[in-house]
A protein has these predicted regions:
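Alpha/beta-hydrolase fold nucleophile elbow
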Residues: 168-180
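Short beta-strand element of the alpha/beta-hydrolase
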Residues: 100-108
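Serine-hydrolase catalytic core
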Residues: 68-69, 75, 79-83, 89-90, ...
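Hydrolase active-site cap/lid region
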Residues: 188-252
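Alpha/beta-hydrolase active-site loop
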Residues: 147-168
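An N-terminal hydrophobic leader/cap segment in hydrolases
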Residues: 11-81
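The serine-hydrolase catalytic nucleophile loop
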Residues: 109-123, 136
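Conserved alpha/beta-hydrolase
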Residues: 124-143
Length: 253
């Protein structure tokens, strides 16, 4: 009996230690994922590519860097709106003479408008598109403590679409465009009461839900289990955003 009790206590202690470790690791990863200022962990060399699973291409990156510099420096109007929850959100308006359409562009996770759209901005300009490049909440000059992975940004997308129609009218068709998390943002906004002038959505490399992308990163990129970690991540998400990580999906929208 004493031996059995000892084995049981040892097993329970090991399980508790394992659970505590998963809890701690998950909280750190959620800070990396959601915080405006990520922990030092993400700033270490190679950590970002490990999280995203991206394989760097130096030639492509060099071209993107130069195009990003040119886009950021190009003359344009800095604009702003207030989100539904009272945050100051920044945007960059690039009008096109004799425009045929308007694009509202949303960048991705821990990125920037002039980086994600650097290499396509020239094409949009040549195709006579006026473009509003949005700075997503909790990034760059937009307020907010937490990145919402589309759960909160979808409402910001609606607000920006309404701002465009209020300022410029509804004569031109509006297209919502997004890359990565920005792609998820515009897709999740599809079931909201968007202005009738919104005629289409362009989404590149979007994921289906925060829960799905966190599970993918944990299993495929970091090679760690997600059963208990997923439950903890959802609790953190609910506490910070007041919405569950799987309550909205691009497939449902």
């Amino acid at each position: 009996m004493k031996k059995a009790a000892k084995i049981t206590i040892t097993a329970l202690s090991a399980a508790a230690a394992c659970g505590a470790a998963i809890y701690g690791v998950t909280h750190v990863l959620m800070d990396v994922a959601m915080n405006r200022q990520p922990p030092r962990l993400r700033k270490k060399k190679g950590s970002a590519s490990r999280l995203t699973g991206e394989t760097p291409n130096e030639g492509f990156r060099a071209a993107q860097k130069e195009a990003s510099r040119q886009l950021a420096a190009a003359p344009h109007e800095v604009v702003a709106i207030q989100s539904r929850d009272g945050l100051h959100l920044a945007g960059h308006w690039f009008p096109c003479p004799d425009a045929e359409r308007i694009i509202i562009a949303f960048h991705g996770w821990h990125s920037a408008w002039h980086w994600d759209f650097a290499l396509i901005s020239g094409f949009w300009r040549r195709e006579r598109c006026s473009v509003l490049y949005v700075e997503q909440r909790a990034q760059q000059n937009s307020e907010g403590d937490y990145i919402g992975f589309g759960l909160t940004e979808r409402e910001d997308c609606l607000a920006w679409a309404r701002w465009v129609t209020e300022r410029f009218g509804t004569a031109l068709p509006i297209y919502l465009a997004g890359v990565s998390m920005g792609g998820t943002t515009v897709l999740m906004a599809a079931d909201l009461p968007l202005p009738e002038a919104v005629r289409g959505i362009i989404a590149d490399s979007a994921y289906t839900s925060p829960h799905a992308i966190w599970q993918h990163v944990a299993r495929k990129n970091l090679h760690i289990p997600f059963v208990l970690g997923g439950w903890i991540a959802d609790r953190v998400c609910r506490r910070r955003l007041s919405v569950g990580s799987d309550e909205c999906s691009t497939l449902d929208s």
